[in-house]
Regions:
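Nucleotide-activated sugar donor-binding and catalytic core shared by glycosyltransferases
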Residues: 1-263, 270-404
Length: 404
């Protein structure tokens, strides 16, 4: 029996690793599945664990008020030392580009335990964009014994870095496995759908605003209103870039009074402060009240994964600086405009599901306007094939680990 330890600490990692935990757990005669979480994103991590019904075997609980990257790295590294000595896994699986993943991979390397890197080979080739994620994934990739690349391009990136071809398996992205699991769960449970609708109302947005004659329509053109879903929290955008993003969103909300703009606000004060500077009077609004003359700009509380997918499924398009959403939203047929200057997911650019708009005010306004005004342009993006997989990435990873 192989001992497989999966280590993660943030909400995006948890979403992408949760279906893999489930996949290994289906073979108790072959694998002892060990889950270690670091708590790098404490509250949001716990929400995902609850959704997928995962109870960690180890919880480092590293989150402290005001900690920086030095603190996170050192706490994960020291915490993993004792966990690895006790559990003695045969392989440690980490995900992507977080500080948790890099520190956990380094800890495993120090004990000469093989590391499997899920979502390996993504590159922007600029170590400061995104920061620190680009360097994190490059370091983790150097440590990894096994590389699970989501696409042929990410495999090519690794080969160009002289990574052994035998160590690389193209699997698709596990985020699509998670997305399909959640969408099926929501669609198959009317009570859950009603509960998520209530959760959104409590967070500050009433999805009935999108209905026609009291009925929810899946066709954007049949709705009385359309929805632009917004997320933004990247460190490299803090400062002038983030102010430009916020100003563009404000101007779009004023330009399109018949479109709702919904922004679940990240807990980070570096995100909330500039939003309150650009959207004057925001702090005076009551729950569920939209900002602006048309009352169509909604800043709501952060959403757990189920609620976010529920809202994303109802959206017309997504405006984001997130990495994972570039993979998820096209799986639901939603065009994505990325408020970053680079992306480690060029496959989406090539496929036409994603477009870079940076943090430039005019470019953001122009591209959102084009998607809202030009039906043919919208259809070209929304109907493009998602390059990130078929929902069977976890199965491929499990089969690889079985065979080693």
């Amino acid at each position: 029996m192989k001992k497989v330890m999966l280590v993660f600490g943030t909400r995006p990692e948890a979403i992408k690793m949760a279906p893999l935990v489930k996949a290994f757990a289906q073979f108790p005669e072959t694998f002892e599945t060990i889950v270690c979480v670091t708590g790098q994103h404490r509250e949001m991590l716990d929400q995902v664990l609850h959704i997928f019904d995962i109870t960690p075997d180890y919880d480092l609980n590293i989150m402290k008020q005001g900690q920086d990257l030095y603190d996170v790295t050192s706490r994960v590294l020291l915490g993993m030392r004792d966990v690895l000595r006790e559990a003695q896994p045969d392989v440690v699986l980490v995900h992507g580009d977080t500080t948790t993943s890099t520190a956990a991979a380094l800890a495993a390397f120090y004990q000469q335990i093989p590391v499997g890197h899920v979502e390996a080979g993504l590159r922007t080739h600029n170590i400061y964009s995104p920061w620190p994620e680009e360097m994190n994934r490059q370091i983790t990739g150097r440590i990894a014994t096994y590389n699970f690349s989501p696409t042929p391009l990410s495999r090519r990136n690794l080969l160009e870095e002289k990574v052994s071809e035998q160590s690389i398996t193209v699997t698709g992205n596990t985020v699509i496995d998670a997305l399909y699991w959640v969408v099926d769960k929501i669609k198959g449970d009317e009570h859950l759908s009603a509960e998520l609708k209530s959760v959104l109302a409590t967070a500050g947005y009433d999805v009935d605003r999108l209905s026609v004659n009291g009925q929810q329509s899946t066709d954007n053109r049949q709705r009385s209103r359309r929805l632009v879903l917004i997320t933004g929290h990247r460190r490299e955008n803090f400062g002038d870039g983030f102010i430009q993003m916020c100003t563009a969103i404000r101007d779009l909300a004023e330009k399109y009074p018949d479109v709702d703009f919904v922004y679940p606000m990240h807990l980070n004060p570096n995100v909330r402060k500039p939003i309150q500077e650009v959207f004057v009077g925001l702090d005076k609004l009551s729950l569920g009240e939209g900002w602006g003359e048309a009352g169509n700009m909604f800043f709501i509380e952060p959403l757990e994964y189920l609620s976010f997918v529920y809202l994303m499924e109802k959206s017309t398009l997504v405006l984001t600086d997130s990495g994972g959403i570039q993979e998820e939203a096209p799986g639901l047929g939603k065009p994505v405009l990325v408020m970053r200057d680079t992306t480690e997911r060029p496959e989406a650019l090539e496929a036409g599901t994603v477009k870079l708009v940076g943090t430039n005010h005019d470019k953001i306004v122009t591209e959102v306007s084009r998607l809202l005004d030009d039906a043919a342009y919208y259809d070209a993006m929304s109907k493009a094939v998602n390059p990130y997989g078929d929902g069977k990435a976890c199965e491929r990873i499990v089969n690889f680990i079985k065979a080693i």
